[in-house]
């Protein structure tokens, strides 16, 4: 799975039978709270993706704002923002080729 930017929001609904996130303890990156707020949309959002994933146990790894940043944790490849899209694609292609 290779979400980037706000795509990891789709991971929030993936829970086990007890209701715990199946991504708890997994390393990933997502559009940061700082990027949400400096981008001008965060103050209008009822919740922030990065914060919510961390609250549910994901191990968020933030790179510099608005810069390419990719995290790979096994078969989970994630990119922080739109600037990371090409790097996510390259990492996914390399993972599939291995």
Task: List each language-model region with its residue ranges.
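Active-site-adjacent pocket-lining segments in enzyme domains
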Residues: 1-98
């Amino acid at each position: 799975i290779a979400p980037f930017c706000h795509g990891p929001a789709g991971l929030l609904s993936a829970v086990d039978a007890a209701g715990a996130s199946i991504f708890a303890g997994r390393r990933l990156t997502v559009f940061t709270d700082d990027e949400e707020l400096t981008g001008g949309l965060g103050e209008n959002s009822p919740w922030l993706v990065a914060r919510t994933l961390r609250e549910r146990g994901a191990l968020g790894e933030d790179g510099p704002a608005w810069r390419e940043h990719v995290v790979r944790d096994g078969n989970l490849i994630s990119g922080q923002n739109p600037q990371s899209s090409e790097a996510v694609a390259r990492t996914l292609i390399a993972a599939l080729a291995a």
